[in-house]
Amino acid sequence: LESISKQYEIRNLFSYQESGIQLTYNRDKAVAEYCKIKDISWHQYQRDGILRGIQNRSGWDKHWFVTMHSPIIQNTFSVQQPLSIESPYPLQHELEQQLNNYPNQFQPAGEDAAFKYLESFVSGRGLLYSKNISKPLESRTSCGRISPYLSWGNISVRQAYQFVYNHS
């Protein structure tokens, strides 16, 4: 944040709540302190049914199902000019080129690809999910294959849940 704030005036910081490990908890505390010192409004949004700071899990599942069944917000963001932020740790040109050449053996990226995997899961591949999930070879062809899309934020857990729920 400090390096970005040297290039831009930051008034608001937007992020989503996550559950993680001690490292991410400590990071969040440091971000909160930084925002307080610099008078930055930090807006954290709930995502994937995460409940932070609960004393126990009583009622957690009910809250999760309510969250998963709530309407999905439609993204109306329009393309803006890219923001140029100079990295204090620039990549070597050769490594940057390698990273820009997306390997064909990887799952295709993006939201459309995520929904294609979900569609193939509910229309056939998922039929043997319970039987094959613990089998290394068979699980590749019967599991959802949506982890990368969830990890990179191409789709949300709520979108995946509602898709499977509505197609079952």
What are the residue ranges of the model-derived segments?
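Catalytic cores of enzymes that engage adenine nucleotides and/or redox cofactors via long glycine-rich
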Residues: 73-168
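Beta-rich, aromatic/charged-enriched effector core domains that present basic-aromatic interfaces
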Residues: 1-114
